[in-house]
Swiss-Prot record:
PANTHER family: HYBRID SIGNAL TRANSDUCTION HISTIDINE KINASE J. Residues 678-950 form the Histidine kinase domain. This is Hybrid signal transduction histidine kinase E. The modification Phosphohistidine is found at residue 681. Residues 7-32, 544-593, 1219-1239, 1283-1294, 1355-1392 have a biased composition (Low complexity). Its EC number is 2.7.13.3. NCBIfam families: sensory_box. The modification 4-aspartylphosphate is found at residue 1625. The gene is dhkE. InterPro entries: CheY-like_superfamily, HATPase_C_sf, His_kinase_dom, HisK_dim/P_dom, HisK_dim/P_sf, PAS, PAS-like_dom_sf, Sig_transdc_His_kin-like_C.
């Protein structure tokens, strides 16, 4: 009877890996899988399993072997066939092939089965080895056996040579042999190791005591020194053996017990026991201490080292265990669907696979990969199911397989066709096979006579000969439908198993779920090494069956219809029984997660993994004759397994498609951005030409209509320039080419510039623009001020656009302090911000009508920098709040969308809708955020944050600046009096702003709220009460403030003047009744008083002895102010203006460092500031002393007349309206005023771009109203006291020359002041500030950045008007609307622009008529008007300037005609070509000698006389002007010396003017200068730019040369400094400006020339562009659009050479 052996072919061996884990399998599932796949036709087999390896295959090897150790009787009964009793013996230790033939049912490759002597005698070797443990324990147990064996031989050796110690050695030999035997038989490894350590220690210590005792006995009776020395040497040798044995015991502890705690315990115990033994030897055996010390120190040292090593090793083990634990979790927690498979047969999957394919793991048993990935079926296909079997000898076959063991083959069919071609190699066995189609068919089995009645398989594939690749449509997956992934030969080569072994294969295919849904999947196929390092560290549940001699496997099962197999696998005490009954004689062919490990000594193990169709009857005869039997042996117990990761990339594919579409859209968008960028740059060129041309035309002689249209052109061009700039910025940001600058700037100056750009538009709408800055905010910052200002201006422009009444407030606060080293102060800063924000609104607690501020306001400054040495970063918040229409909540989310506008129509509010979008992007670039809060119908609050830096760890905050100002006042005036008083304005927010600024200098004033008539008081009180109840709620405060402000605005004309007078009087009385009233100074700041209140307080203050300084709040809407007011506090309120006011009160001069900090001025500016301030004060003091008596008399005479009128005194004179034509001039002016809104749709637009071109300018109103007192006396009782004190004294910064300034003639003084850009205000104080304007005279080109300059409007007409109610209104026609016309004219005044005096920013003043011969003509003379006092006066002053054309669109400036109080005549000198006459107003004729008004008949007679006098004066002026023109022409043609026209040359040459001003003596006289006409070279490829710039230069008496490109420029420059200045365009097609400049600098070096002044021309005015210009050798750059004021600044700085 043949012996049947079943063996499995395995995958080739591979080295193990311990870094990857595999999924878990329970033993129950494994048993079920095994039993479900074992065919009922297999009779009587044994399974012997191994513990360390797993073998998973799909083949059956039936081997006939003889085994003497295991006898298994397998019985099988069958009704249809003869019973065959087969004795199948499987030898675990030495499998042997006895049968000459073997039957191989194999779809995998074959391996050679090697046999060796060691393997045949494995059973004998196992006797001397320990039982199977886990690998680490097994190795330690082998070491223990080795030590026992070694000690047996050592003790035997010592027994021979050291016979005196034979009892110890005999005990050692016996104990070691016993321990060795016990170790091989028991699994109690730790107990045996512990006994071994204990026995070794006892033997070793006994040996030490014995040698010590012998040494003492032998040395007692020895007297010879040599003998004693020999004994000592002998003892030392034996003691050395003791120490070595002890050290070996300590090392063994560390080896046998790897756990740190247990090993340390044993080590310490052994050392303690050693110490005890040596103590006994010292006291009992008299052992020498040196030997004891040696025996103690050596083991302790070794123990310490070993303990340290054990500790490090334990840490490493913990890390390894943690790493393995993480690896075990990777499988289940992976985001990829992981599949463990063998040749496409699914072994295990993770939870992600279940989610992707929507199937449970339990349903995946017996599944294949291609059921879910159909296109991978061809990957695992090989042949058509015809396995070749050869009849050659076994040895030859094995040799061939051994030669090709390392070569992998794969035969993949054409997956695109239904017909499959199979190829096999004669000398190779394919690695991967198709289990669907390549199964063993019945024909082959019948021919082999292996099985009878073999049936086709039904579970996998009934079509044995048809091999289909399930081609799934890829239309919904993003893959191509044209071909499969395995269609061509290249794919076959690429997807071969050879490539899989080298590197993983990644491919995209189509996945299908059981529901039929398709998706695109990315599959990664790779081969992993077996990572089984033991059952405790692997995620597999292995069936570790320890096979001993006593193991028996009995498989008995009887069934009438089936052959049943019962496999009883015994592993010590574990028995696994599985039964399988199948009535259909069919079994599942796929085994999932079956791992049966066999062969303890790395021998072959058999695994039953796949059984094909089988018959119920076996023919052993055909089996022996037709089959071949190959016993496949594995070299190693560890093998490879295949891993497949699947990722659902449907979304990725769709995203890729969308990404491609997005890329195409981005390309189109980029093309549009490039187009916009190019067009924007190109459009700016003609716009710059338009604006410059308009500025040139504005200086010519135009009538009112022409000037009106010219203003429309200018406003339209400004609007278009802003649109183009927004589009350009937007396109740069979108293209990612936008860069921010980092420069140092002054926050206060930047905010003032921003507010003044928009203030004129706000003033026209009646809106207050206020500033609130928290005290802890730094004022010197590093960042991009241009972009911060742009964001603020965008917010301000929108706020003003959507606000019709109320106010717009700019608030700055600290959000957070970003410190590089410490961030501990962030909370403090935030708390300060909250407190300071509350401080802005707590003035609205209006329980009483008069609200005061206490001294405990929360103005804490807690910016504590704890030793930070780096730059501090602050996150500042800029907020713009308005009381406008508000925004609906549903619209807020769309506000920052590009091109979005409220209401969806740009016609109502204009604009492109890019402002907020650009602001948002700029804020993001600056590291901040943008936000908005709005209540519809109440107002909005837009805010943004920006990260700005400071250059110091102790930044200068606003609070520290105020403290410095307060300290400066104390130093300059040690006996400084206490200031008290109050503030009043019709808008409570204006008072709050003033209060906050004054509080910085420790000046606390009370605030008086607006007092409305009785019908509105209730409403205001309710609002005030609401403010009291909601001080801590910012939103409520804002709303209530807005309501309160709206009430004030609605009732501007309903202010209760009587009640207001009563409140003022009470406050003044309260301050005057103070006991120490001598040192008490009363400071009062109010808006303009009514006529009755003004007269009342004049009389009241004259009766008081206190020092009362009454300042008026003025926004230059006033035509003139009464001398009752001590000074003016300008609107919009700013810190510099208030500082000037406070220093005037104390009669002190501002220190230089504080002046520069407030104004950004230079040292020269400060010197001029002190010089002209002292000169004017000194001269005016003398004039006031001379005229004091006359003015008092005139005031007394005119008092009755002025008090009888209801209008204020400053409206006594009618407005001036003189046009170039005599007929219909008044109608033209009136029509222009009436149609102002309709004349230009952009009249309310804020010209942001032009306002921002001139950076670092402070657009403050320059000329305040004059001291206009018709009574002729000074009503200010304190003016004499102020003027009598020399303000130079006590100032440490004054030059010595300034203290000895002699009195100047008033005409010379004013001429010098005008030439320096300084202006004398009504309080004898010089205002010397910068402001933004395109013309120094405030023409229609003045941008929306300043305020109107005050003037006395005078309307002169030739005919009488009987219906005129005003004394000075004379019209040609009878018109009842004169008052309305006058009012319109009064409300439309422009700025008289003056610039700060510095070399870089100098602008010529208006013409000053010094005497009858010397006239200094203005540069920009259009329709000049000369207003002069009588020539008999010692202080005659004639001012030539432009006419106020009264058109609100043109915004022409008004002039301040000084009044000669003595002669009471006002002479107006016109220089019009058509009407060249002087208009003289004689106030004695109008008011009479006593100051009273005369009847109308007398007035008409006086007017006729005046007209005659005017005609005579006009004729004289015409002659003078003709002479002047002839002289000027001769001077230009002959280039004569300056002579009598010295001042004219100064004005026409800013460079000479700067030099002359610096060389002025104390009297303001300048030394004679020999002038020459300056020459400029313009290098620009655009004709328009050359033309415009040349015209501007010619107006300033410059000669101009041209060059179209750099090559022509190089030809023009032939000698050293042949041009005073060169304007170089940067972008030119032929040799641009940068290269031309470099070539010029090289030429200068070669020829040793002095360098030329080269200024770049470009629309880019950023600091980064400026750095590029400087790097190439340019001196500076001039930004476009070029205005007259920027051109003058450039010429002043680079328009000549000093050396």
């Amino acid at each position: 009877m043949d012996k049947l052996k079943i063996n499995n072919n395995l995958s080739p061996p591979s080295s193990p890996s311990s870094s990857t884990t595999t999924p878990n399998l329970s033993s129950t599932n494994l048993e079920n899988n095994l039993n479900s796949n074992i065919n009922n036709n297999i009779n009587n087999f044994n399974l012997n399993n191994s513990t360390n390896t797993f073998n998973n295959s799909n083949n059956i090897i039936i081997n006939n072997n003889n085994n003497n150790n295991n006898n298994n009787n397998n019985n099988n009964n069958n009704n249809n066939n003869n019973s065959n009793n087969n004795n199948n013996n499987i030898n675990n230790n030495n499998p042997n092939v006895n049968s000459p033939n073997e039957v191989i049912l194999n779809n995998n490759f074959l391996k050679q089965n090697k046999k060796g002597f060691f393997k045949r005698n494995k059973k004998m070797i196992e006797i001397f080895l320990p039982p199977k443990f886990k690998s680490p324990i097994y190795r330690r147990c082998c070491i223990l056996l080795g030590e026992c064996g070694v000690y047996v031989f050592i003790y035997m050796f010592f027994l021979i040579f050291l016979r005196s110690f034979y009892p110890i050695f005999i005990c050692g030999i016996v104990s070691m042999i016993v321990l060795y035997i016990v170790s091989t038989k028991t699994t109690k490894y730790k107990l045996v190791a512990l006994i071994y350590i204990f026995v070794q220690s006892i033997l070793n210590f006994t040996f030490f005591l014995q040698i010590t005792n012998n040494f003492n006995n032998n040395t007692v009776n020895i007297n010879n020194t040599d003998d004693y020395s020999n004994e000592v040497i002998e003892f030392s040798k034996l003691n050395f053996l003791f120490i070595m044995n002890l050290i070996l015991s300590l090392i063994s502890i560390q080896i046998f017990f790897p756990k740190f705690t247990f090993s340390i315990t044993l080590t310490c115990s052994l050392n303690i026991f050693n110490i005890i033994i040596h103590l006994i030897s010292i006291y009992s055996l008299n052992t020498k201490k040196l030997i004891v010390f040696q025996n103690l120190i050596v083991p302790i040292t070794v123990s310490f080292l070993l303990s340290f090593y054990s500790y490090i090793l334990s840490i490493d083990n913990q890390e390894i265990e943690a790493k393995e634990k993480r690896f075990r979790n990777i499988f289940d927690t992976s985001s990829e669907a992981l599949v463990i498979h063998k040749n496409g047969l699914i072994i295990d999957v993770n939870s992600t696979f279940e989610k992707i394919f929507q199937i449970k793991q339990s349903d995946l048993i017996n599944g294949t990969i291609w059921e879910y990935l159909p296109e991978l079926e061809s990957f695992f296909q090989n042949t058509n199911g015809n396995s070749k079997y050869t009849n050659q000898s076994l040895q030859q076959q094995l040799q061939q397989q051994q030669q090709q063991q390392q070569q992998l083959y794969n035969t993949i069919t054409n997956g695109g066709n239904n017909k499959q071609t199979s190829t096999t190699s004669a000398n190779s066995t394919p690695r991967y096979n198709n289990y669907n189609n390549n199964n063993i068919n019945s024909n082959n089995l019948n021919n082999l006579n292996v099985f009878n009645n073999l049936n086709n398989l039904n579970n996998l594939n009934n079509n044995n000969n048809n091999h289909h690749i399930h081609k799934v449509s890829r239309s919904n997956t993003g893959l191509s439908d044209s071909s499969s992934i395995f269609d061509d030969s290249d794919s076959v080569d690429f997807f071969s198993m050879k490539n899989i072994n080298k590197c993983p294969i990644v491919l995209d295919t189509v996945g299908i779920t059981p529901c039929g849904s398709e998706f695109c999947a990315q599959v990664k196929i790779e081969r992993k090494k077996d990572m089984l390092i033991g059952s405790g560290t692997s995620s597999f549940n292995l069936l570790n069956n320890n096979n001993n001699n006593n193991n028996n496997n009995n498989n008995n099962n009887n069934n009438n219809n089936n052959n049943n197999n019962n496999n009883n696998n015994s592993n010590n005490n574990n028995n696994n029984n599985s039964n399988n009954n199948n009535n259909n004689n069919n079994i599942n062919n796929n085994i999932s997660n079956n791992i049966i490990n066999n062969n303890n000594n790395n021998n072959n193990s058999g695994i039953i993994t796949n059984l094909s169709q089988q018959s119920n009857n076996l023919s052993t005869t055909n089996l022996n004759t037709s089959s071949k039997i190959i016993n496949h042996k594995h070299k190693n117990s560890k093998q490879d397994f295949d891993v497949m990761s699947i990722v659902d990339i449907s979304a990725k594919k769709k995203l890729m498609i969308a990404d491609q579409a997005l890329r195409r859209a981005e390309e189109l968008n980029q093309a549009k951005i490039n187009f916009l960028t190019t067009v924007s740059h190109e459009v700016r060129t003609p716009i710059n030409g338009i604006l410059a041309s308009v500025e040139i035309l504005d200086g010519s002689q135009l009538d009112v209509t022409q000037r009106d249209f010219l203003s429309c052109i200018k406003q339209s061009a400004d609007y278009l320039l802003d649109l183009i700039t927004d589009i350009l910025d937007f396109s740069k940001i979108e293209a990612g080419k936008f860069e921010l600058d980092r420069v140092e700037f002054n926050l206060i100056t930047m905010l003032e510039e921003s507010i003044n750009i928009v203030y004129r538009t706000a003033q026209e709408r009646g809106i207050e623009v206020l500033t609130f800055i928290d005290p802890d905010v730094p004022i010197i910052l590093i960042g991009d001020p241009y972009r911060v200002k742009q964001c603020v201006l965008n917010f301000l422009s929108n706020a003003i656009k959507f606000t019709h009444k109320g106010q717009v407030m700019v608030k700055v606060s600290i959000v957070d302090q970003i410190n590089n080293n410490n961030n501990n102060n962030n909370n403090n800063n935030n708390n300060n911000n909250n407190n300071n924000n509350n401080n802005n609104n707590n003035n609205n607690n209006n329980n009483n009508k008069i609200v005061g501020f206490s001294n405990n306001n929360n103005n804490n400054n807690n910016n504590n920098n704890n030793g930070n040495n780096g730059i501090l970063n602050f996150k500042l918040s800029f907020s713009v709040e308005d009381s406008g229409v508000g925004i609906k909540e549903e619209v807020l989310d769309c506000l920052f969308t590009p091109f979005h506008q409220l209401g969806g129509s740009p016609r109502k509010y204009l604009g492109t809708g890019l402002g907020l979008s650009i602001s948002k992007k700029l804020t993001t670039l600056m590291g901040g955020e943008i936000g908005v809060k709005s209540v519809y119908g109440v107002g909005s609050a837009f805010s943004f944050t920006s990260i700005l830096s400071t250059t110091s760890t102790t930044p200068i905050s606003l609070q520290s600046l105020g403290s410095s100002l307060s300290i400066a006042l104390n130093n300059l005036s040690p006996t400084i009096p206490k200031i008290s008083g109050f503030i009043y304005d019709d808008n409570i927010h204006t008072s709050n702003s003033l209060f906050n600024f004054l509080k910085l200098m420790n000046i606390n004033l009370k605030i008086i709220n607006p007092i409305i008539n009785n019908n509105n008081n209730n409403n205001n009180n309710n609002n005030n009460n609401n403010n009291n109840n909601n001080n801590n709620n910012n939103n409520n405060n804002n709303n209530n403030n807005d309501n309160n402000n709206n009430n004030n605005n609605n009732n501007d004309n309903n202010i209760d003047q009587q009640q207001l007078k009563f409140e003022f009087e009470n406050e003044i009385d309260k301050y005057c009744n103070v006991e120490d009233d001598n040192n008490n100074v009363i400071l009062i700041i109010t808006n303009q008083l009514s006529n009755d209140n003004l007269n009342y307080f004049k009389d009241k203050i004259n009766q008081l002895n206190n020092s009362i300084y009454w300042f008026v709040l003025c926004d230059n809407g006033l035509k003139a102010i009464d001398p009752f007011y001590y000074g003016i506090v300008k609107k919009p309120n700013n810190l510099l203006n208030l500082v000037d006011t406070v220093f005037k009160v104390y009669n002190c001069q501002l220190p230089q460092d504080l002046y520069q900090l407030l104004t950004n001025g230079s040292k020269d500016d400060y010197k001029n500031y002190l010089k002209y301030r002292n000169v004017v004060i000194k001269k005016i003091t003398e004039d006031n002393e001379k005229k004091q008596q006359q003015q008092q008399q005139q005031q007394q005479q005119m008092g009755d007349t002025l008090s009888s009128t209801k209008s204020p005194q400053y409206t006594n004179l009618p407005p001036l309206d003189i046009s170039s034509s005599s007929n219909g001039s008044l109608n033209k002016s009136n029509r222009s005023n009436l149609l102002r809104k309709s004349s230009s749709v952009y009249s309310d637009h804020v010209a942001i771009t032009r306002g921002m071109v001139q950076v670092n300018r402070s657009p403050r109103p320059s000329t305040p109203p004059p001291l206009f007192n018709l009574k002729g006396n000074n009503s200010n009782p304190n003016s004499t006291e102020l003027n009598s004190t020399n303000s130079v004294n006590g100032n440490p910064n004054n030059d010595s020359t300034l203290e000895t300034i002699e009195p100047l003639n008033i005409s010379e003084t004013v001429g010098d002041l005008c030439s320096s850009g300084s202006v004398i205000n009504n309080s004898n104080f010089i205002i010397n500030n910068n402001f933004l304007t395109s013309s120094p005279y405030g023409s229609c080109l003045t941008p929306n950045s300043g305020t109107t300059s005050p003037s006395i409007p005078i309307n002169i007409n030739n005919n009488d008007n009987n219906n005129n109610n005003n004394n000075n209104n004379n019209n040609n026609n009878n018109n009842n609307n004169n008052n309305n016309n006058n009012n319109n004219n009064n409300n439309n005044n422009n700025n008289n622009s003056f610039k700060k005096l510095e070399p870089d920013n100098f602008s010529p003043p208006p013409s000053i008529l010094i005497n009858d011969n010397n006239i200094i003509p203005a540069l920009n003379v259009t329709t000049p008007i000369t207003i002069s006092t009588s020539t008999s006066s010692s202080s005659s002053l004639l001012i030539n300037n432009e006419i106020n054309n009264k058109s609100t669109t043109s915004k022409r400036p008004s002039f301040i005609p000084p009044l000669d109080i003595q002669s009471k005549k006002l002479i107006i000198n016109t220089a019009d070509e058509n009407h060249k006459n002087n208009c003289i107003i004689d106030f004695e004729q109008i008011f009479g000698q006593d100051g009273k008004q005369q009847p109308q008949q007398q007035q008409q007679q006086q007017q006729q006389q005046q007209q005659q006098q005017q005609q005579q004066q006009q004729q004289q002026q015409q002659q003078q002007q003709q002479q002047q023109q002839q002289q000027q022409q001769q001077q230009q043609q002959q280039k004569l010396n300056i002579g009598n026209q010295q001042q004219q040359q100064i004005l026409s040459s800013p460079r000479l003017q700067s030099q002359l001003l610096s060389n002025c003596d104390s009297l303001g006289n300048t030394p004679p200068v020999t002038p020459h006409r300056r020459n400029a070279l313009i290098v620009d490829d655009t004709e328009l730019n050359r033309k415009v710039l040349a015209q501007l230069l010619r107006r300033m008496d410059w000669s101009v040369s041209f060059a179209e490109n750099g090559i022509e420029a190089l030809k023009e420059i032939t000698s050293e400094r042949c041009f005073d200045i060169i304007f170089m365009d940067c972008q030119m097609p032929i040799l641009d400006g940068f290269e031309t400049t470099k070539l010029l600098r090289l030429r200068e070096l070669e020829n040793n020339w002095k360098p030329l002044n080269i200024v770049a021309l470009s629309a880019d005015s950023s600091s980064s562009f400026g750095q590029v210009c400087f790097d190439c050798g340019m001196n500076g750059y001039l930004g476009k659009p070029i205005t007259l004021i920027t051109l003058k600044d450039t010429l002043l700085k680079w328009g000549g050479y000093r050396d």
